[in-house]
Amino acid sequence: MTTANQVQPSAESAVAGRVVRVIGPVVDVEFPRGQQPALFNALTVEVDLEAVAKTITLEVAQHLGDNLVRAVSMAPTDGLIRGAEVTDTGKPISVPVGDVVKGHVFNALGDCLDEPGLGRDGEQWGIHREPPAFDQLEGKTEILETGIKVIDLLTPYVKGGKIGLFGGAGVGKTVLIQEMITRIAREFSGTSVFAGVGERTREGTDLFLEMEEMGVLQDTALVFGQMDEPPGVRMRVALSGLTMAEYFRDVQNQDVLLFIDNIFRFTQAGSEVSTLLGRMPSAVGYQPTLADEMGVLQERITSTKGRSITSLQAVYVPADDYTDPAPATTFAHLDATTELDRSIASKGIYPAVNPLTSTSRILEPGIVGERHYEVAQRVIHILQKNKELQDIIAILGMDELSEEDKITVQRARRLERFLGQNFFVAEKFTGIPGSYVPLADTIDAFERICDGEFDAYPEQAFNGLGGLDDVEAAYKKMTEK
């Protein structure tokens, strides 16, 4: 099947060039006069390394003039020599699309890693495609209910929107993404595409095995370009995953979830490639084309009429600095931001979402409803007031607070603990079953806590549980002791 904005291969026969220079992952290739390949075309070259033949794929990045092109290698260039013959494939890097990709692991070039050769006989799409036209975009706004209390109440996700998970190392970004994949597969029977961009190979293996164990692998396609791969691969793997997701949206008319872990590594790979191509670095050493590269990716992640791609993107924040150009550029494209805070994680509250700094553009009465909005604002007000009182408590102690402030602090502590929740993917570590809390129950529970119905309950009764039934059961257990 062909779509209007699908990249089509050239009808011309393959053109051969030769390697004239190799500088790490950057390769200069000379072609016959007038037969230079187009930008983003895939080139292939055969090499022999220690008596083992392999094919290296290159992607055209620049036209240098004098019939020379500069290409970025998608594999280590060991064994590549000057004079080696290079073939222009006449089309961009292409990946398999459709049901064949579900339940399997691919690399950025579309090669199946768990079942070599899978998908190469079927339909393939080029990874460089135009975003949907303006008149194809969906105008209505709809909430994506996750069953995670802190998200549904305070930073609701938009169906077909872009969500950023911000946080430093080790605060739970990948765990939250794994939990979302599990919940979407269980609750909505939806299709998910996971793009592992520049993260640890061990995490990719763990994710594959966990999804297989939990029975959600058959509804998910996984595309990996991990930390040990060349920068060209890490820069393109997000586009490969997005292309698979676009097929499910545009051809199969499905609502798709696209998970990208980690979007910062996409930026980092672009910076490496930019330096290798000889471009002058911009702020903090990033590439001068940072905003443009991010826009090309993000503009394709959108809802069209009747179907959507909802994207959840983990964003590593270097040294917890939110003014760094990489996370700052990502902010501009997001509909909701979920900030994971180290200070909350240190209290043992997971997910470690900071309710005061996380945002959502749809948290307004006209979209989520008056009651939801009012309860969310009450929760935020109590938590904010508690934060303001912490300095006084640290210096003078709780006894110096007014009675009203004491009640506020005690309710804030209960709310803070109740915002934590058991995850399905963490069951085998904690021994506590995961919980799904419907949005209506979440709103009702927080309204009752804000009203003071549970002021007599100890804070420990609210630790990382599901709904109010769990709180009451925990309280009953504590009183029996």
UniProtKB/Swiss-Prot annotation:
Residues binding ATP: G167, G168, A169, G170, V171, G172, K173, T174
Broad EC category: translocase
Membrane topology: Peripheral membrane protein
Keyword list, A-Z: ATP synthesis, ATP-binding, Cell membrane, CF(1), Hydrogen ion transport, Ion transport, Membrane, Nucleotide-binding, Translocase, Transport
EC number: 7.1.2.2
Pfam assignment, any one: ATP-synt_VA_C
Subcellular location, principal: membrane
Gene Ontology CC: plasma membrane; proton-transporting ATP synthase complex
UniProt GO molecular function: ATP binding; ATP hydrolysis activity; proton-transporting ATP synthase activity, rotational mechanism
Domain of life of the native organism: Bacteria
Subcellular compartments: Cell membrane
Catalytic reaction list: ATP + H2O + 4 H(+)(in) = ADP + phosphate + 5 H(+)(out)
Quaternary organization: F-type ATPases have 2 components, CF(1) - the catalytic core - and CF(0) - the membrane proton channel. CF(1) has five subunits: alpha(3), beta(3), gamma(1), delta(1), epsilon(1). CF(0) has three main subunits: a(1), b(2) and c(9-12). The alpha and beta chains form an alternating ring which encloses part of the gamma chain. CF(1) is attached to CF(0) by a central stalk formed by the gamma and epsilon chains, while a peripheral stalk is formed by the delta and b chains.
Function in brief: Produces ATP from ADP in the presence of a proton gradient across the membrane. The catalytic sites are hosted primarily by the beta subunits.
Family: Belongs to the ATPase alpha/beta chains family.
Name by which UniProt lists this protein: ATP synthase subunit beta
